[in-house]
């Protein structure tokens, strides 16, 4: 299963970017024996719309287009079908999971035959309700609100951690 991260906004160079790249590199090396291939990060430009609602709708449209391209014949709305793409949205109002539960979900998506997993980090205004309804999972990284750069670091580390959990590697200590 190919794993992609879609992020609204750009990650500037600096220590945060280096840390994100380090964890994605680890995930890219740990994933293939488990059937997980890291396909990279796609940066989606922030909308310049006048209102939060318009900005969220424009950013959601860009994510919808990328998801439709990735699905290669899967369902167009209301979740995804077996063999298509799965969508996980990061959102402060999402479900809070532990690392082992997150790893189990990633493993189940892979085992169910999903060809692609897309993890989407929204813009400063969050995600459009239509995109939220389309997601297979809306996930919160805890109850705190995180800057987008830190959210990228956290999801990069959690994807790597999920791979190590699925592999039975001792990186994760429960």
From Swiss-Prot:
InterPro entries: Alpha/beta_knot_MTases (IPR029028), RlmH-like (IPR003742), tRNA_m1G_MTases_N (IPR029026). It comes from the Bacteria. It comes from Brucella melitensis biotype 2 (strain ATCC 23457). It is found in: Cytoplasm. PANTHER family: METHYLTRANSFERASE, RIBOSOMAL RNA LARGE SUBUNIT METHYLTRANSFERASE H. Its main location: cytoplasm. Its EC number is 2.1.1.177. One of its GO terms (molecular function) is rRNA (pseudouridine-N3-)-methyltransferase activity. S-adenosyl-L-methionine binds at residues 90, 122, 141-146. The gene is rlmH. Belongs to the RNA methyltransferase RlmH family. Keywords: Cytoplasm, Methyltransferase, rRNA processing, S-adenosyl-L-methionine, Transferase. NCBIfam families: PRK00103.2-3. One of its GO terms (cellular component) is cytoplasm. It catalyses: pseudouridine(1915) in 23S rRNA + S-adenosyl-L-methionine = N(3)-methylpseudouridine(1915) in 23S rRNA + S-adenosyl-L-homocysteine + H(+). CDD domains: RlmH-like. This is Ribosomal RNA large subunit methyltransferase H. Homodimer. Specifically methylates the pseudouridine at position 1915 (m3Psi1915) in 23S rRNA.
